[in-house]
């Protein structure tokens, strides 16, 4: 099956018609999370008239074809996106715009393992789509290069807290960890944090607790290594401090700020999509700095394209907010570095989508 994607594309159809399978297939190639890229036995198609026990081997492939609008329109900057994939471009004929073919190929074989053995590789295909594929036209695609195309997949059953916390691997952590901190800022923050720790330790109760921890540890541990146990309230370097950064909300019905964990499912889902939008804005600014040769605020090299795939955005969202949500998802799709894919069963969503942007499964 071939699916054509626009800037914003909405997949509709019955339950179990393949909408999620299409998104998971793309996620298997372009997810930043290595766990999402693992294939399972159930990913391979089982023909209706076949007994699974009779099968010795199966294969599958998923191919993604990318066109570069800046080349087709002969406008806009080409310095950022083109060099990464230049050697892998395909041109059908003289005067035609080049495009990129990326294909995941996988095989399953029966083995002593109860699930069988699965091998998969991702290739660049350097021949036109209508030509026969030969080994000479296949090149292994490195994960380093594939990371220039990223997919953010938001499933229908979602736990936004995992991404909203500044945990290792989250969007916010990746951005904050790549900030080019000035040396003077690092030293200043280190001094302020040390002063804060010293202020805590001036309290008699804290001092009693600190001494008890230190003295009892000496009784339990006789080795010179790790012998000095000290109570510390804040990390003494900026890298450790930013790991504890989080977004808080105010005003609230009580006299304190709320963390994301205290918000309802609907607000958490909305804020998660808002965070994706924010990170794409930041990455656009990073891209502008790189292309203009300015002093870089970040060491991160952002992806060329981010595919934002949201299943059933209507989940947990009040009906009167759906119009605004679809409007924001459409805004994301219009950014130069992103594309949006939705799935939905909701008439309130579908009526806000142009017929040309619908794909029926």
Description of each model-found segment:
Residues 1-15, 23-70:
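Extreme N-terminal "head/tail" segments of very large remodeling/mechanoenzyme assemblies
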Residues 6, 65-69, 107, 157, ...:
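Solvent-exposed residues in well-ordered beta-strands and their adjoining turns
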Residues 17, 27-35, 69-71, 109, ...:
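Non-catalytic alpha-helical coupling and interface elements of nucleotide-dependent molecular machines
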Residues 34-57, 70-194, 207, 257:
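Glycine-rich phosphate-binding loops of NTPases
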Residues 58-62, 98-102, 147-151, 304-305, ...:
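Short glycine-/polar-rich loops that comprise or flank the Walker A/P-loop
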């Amino acid at each position: 099956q071939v699916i054509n994607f626009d800037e914003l594309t909405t997949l509709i159809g019955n339950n179990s018609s393949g909408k999620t399978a299409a998104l998971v297939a793309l996620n298997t190639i372009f997810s930043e999370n290595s766990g999402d890229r693992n294939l399972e036995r159930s990913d391979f198609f089982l023909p209706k008239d076949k007994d699974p026990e009779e099968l010795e081997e199966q294969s599958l492939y998923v191919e993604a074809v990318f066109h570069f609008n800046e080349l087709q329109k002969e406008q806009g900057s080409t310095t950022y996106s083109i060099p990464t994939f230049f050697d892998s471009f395909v041109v059908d004929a003289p005067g035609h715009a080049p495009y990129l073919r990326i294909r995941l190929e996988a095989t399953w074989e029966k083995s002593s393992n109860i699930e069988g053995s699965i091998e998969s590789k991702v290739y660049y295909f350097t021949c036109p789509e209508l030509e026969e594929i030969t080994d000479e036209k296949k090149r292994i695609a490195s994960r380093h290069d594939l990371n220039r195309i990223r997919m953010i997949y938001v499933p229908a059953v979602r736990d936004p807290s995992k991404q909203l916390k500044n945990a290792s691997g989250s969007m916010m952590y990746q951005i904050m960890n790549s900030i080019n901190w000035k040396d003077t800022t690092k030293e200043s923050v280190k001094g302020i944090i040390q002063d804060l720790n010293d202020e805590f330790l001036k309290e008699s109760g804290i001092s009693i607790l600190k001494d008890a921890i230190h003295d009892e540890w000496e009784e339990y541990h006789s080795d010179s290594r790790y012998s000095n146990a000290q109570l510390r309230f804040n990390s003494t370097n900026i890298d450790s401090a930013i790991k504890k950064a989080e977004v808080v909300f105010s005003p609230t019905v009580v006299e304190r700020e709320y963390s994301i964990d205290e918000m309802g499912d609907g607000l958490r889902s909305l804020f998660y999509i808002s965070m994706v939008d924010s990170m794409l804005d930041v990455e656009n600014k990073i891209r502008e700095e790189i292309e203009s040769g300015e002093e870089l605020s970040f060491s991160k090299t952002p992806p060329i394209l981010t595919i934002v795939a949201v299943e059933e955005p209507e989940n947990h969202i009040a009906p009167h907010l759906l119009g605004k949500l679809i409007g924001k998802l459409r805004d994301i799709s219009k950014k130069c570095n992103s594309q949006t894919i939705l799935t939905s069963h909701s008439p309130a969503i579908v009526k806000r989508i142009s017929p040309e942007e619908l794909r029926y499964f």
